[in-house]
From Swiss-Prot:
Main function: Catalyzes the hydrolysis of N-succinyl-L,L-diaminopimelic acid (SDAP), forming succinate and LL-2,6-diaminopimelate (DAP), an intermediate involved in the bacterial biosynthesis of lysine and meso-diaminopimelic acid, an essential component of bacterial cell walls.
Name the UniProt record assigns to this protein: Succinyl-diaminopimelate desuccinylase
Cofactor note text: Binds 2 Zn(2+) or Co(2+) ions per subunit.
Catalyzed reaction equations: N-succinyl-(2S,6S)-2,6-diaminopimelate + H2O = (2S,6S)-2,6-diaminopimelate + succinate
Length: 380
């Protein structure tokens, strides 16, 4: 009997797997996949839950991989939800709950597709599923741990599809062939505290920070590249910790986030930020320090065999030719791309991370059909 992706999605939503809790989600999937003949291994690292599953021969020349996550973001105010966020309730044509869109429906669809495919038409090759419980958190011991373990064990994927939600409005509209890089810069300006009536006796870190922020925000990083929109810089915090209106504080902190295309690297942007900070410091006499966190570099899987395989399957099942895009935030594809070519395709993601997160039930079975067709075409 075919594996029902709708029922599996509901079962997964009922698992309260808020990062870093496993919540029973990977235990459920491991049982299903083991019963279907997959070789399953828990690859937990530093308490972070991860699941590896392979059907077929280790080291096969053609190995198709799926990647996804079962961890979810916190519910927030549970009283604000129309339905139980971990109830997996189906009502009004929707399946409700935290993770319904991001991305338990995607995981359920590719698990169901893989199980049905290998049982109905066993391929000459292998199918690997890598599913983590650490995508919404720090992403340090999740997919990276799985890929590290695979390298040690001689396991490899030839290509990989990440089942994150990718479509803006309708299933089939968009797939991701790359992602922008992301980095966060933390600035600390240290001046000299003083009375606001005597500004000449102080060194105002707020004024210095404002000058720096104005320079950064008004600078055009680029005009975009062949497959990427222009890079963006957003100021996300400015803080002095100063409740007094007649005191010039000694300290001011600010944070900016940069989403960057393939014209830049995290290192090149840090060099630019350091130069800008040094120039403002020289102009104002205020010391400005910088630390930065690079969450991921930009990457691109150039249009080719893998993207065409996915596009054909999507068009065959939905009638829509998916637009190849690099928009949006980061995903674990940024880690997979160092292992093998990777493309992302999944459901409409309009309600992910929101109160009353939900997925249209009528989309889940078609997503399974798309994934199953991709497998069939890949191994034909």
């Amino acid at each position: 009997m075919p594996l029902d992706p709708v029922a599996l999605t509901a079962d997964l939503v009922r698992c309260p797997s808020v990062t870093p809790e496993e919540g029973g989600a990977l235990v459920l999937l491991e049982r299903i996949l083991t019963e279907a003949g997959f070789d399953c291994r828990r690859v937990d690292r530093n308490g972070v839950p991860n699941l590896f599953a392979r059907w077929g021969r280790k080291g096969a020349n053609r190995t198709f991989g799926f990647n996804g996550h079962t961890d979810v973001v916190p519910v927030g105010d549970a009283a604000a939800w129309t339905r139980d966020p971990f109830g997996g309730e189906i009502a009004d044509g929707w399946l409700w709950g935290r993770g319904a869109t991001d991305m338990k429906s995607g995981v359920a669809a590719f698990v169901a597709a893989a199980v049905d495919f290998v049982q109905e038409t066993p391929p000459d090759g292998a199918v690997i599923l890598t599913i983590t419980g650490d995508e919404e958190g720090d992403s340090v011991d999740g997919t990276t741990a799985l890929l590290d373990w695979m390298a040690t064990e001689g396991e490899a994927m030839t290509v990989c599809l990440v089942g994150e939600p990718t479509c803006p409005e309708r299933l089939g509209e968009m797939m991701k062939i790359g992602r922008r890089g992301s980095m966060t810069a933390f600035f600390t300006a240290r001046g000299v505290q003083g009375h606001s009536a005597y500004p000449h006796r102080a060194k105002n870190p707020v004024s210095a920070m404002a000058r720096l922020i104005d320079r950064l925000a008004s600078h055009e990083l680029d005009k975009g590249t062949g497959h990427f929109d222009p890079s963006t810089l957003a100021v996300t915090t400015i803080d002095t910790g100063n409740p007094a209106t007649n005191v010039i504080p000694a300290l001011c902190r600010a944070t900016v986030n940069i989403r960057f295309n393939d014209r830049h690297s995290g290192a090149s942007l840090i060099r630019w930020l350091e130069q800008e900070a040094a120039e403002v410091a020289a102009e104002t006499g205020v010391e400005i320090g910088l630390s930065a966190k690079i969450s991921g570099e930009s990457f691109l899987t150039p249009p080719g065999e893998l993207s065409e395989l996915v596009a054909r399957a999507v068009e065959a099942e939905t009638g829509l030719r998916p637009e190849p895009s690099t928009s949006g935030g980061t995903s674990d594809a940024r880690f997979v791309r160092a292992h093998c070519p990777v493309v992302e395709f999944g459901l409409v993601g309009k309600t992910m991370h929101q109160v009353d997160e939900r997925v249209e039930v009528a989309q889940i079975e078609p997503l399974k059909a798309i994934y199953k067709r991709i497998l069939k075409d890949y191994f034909t």
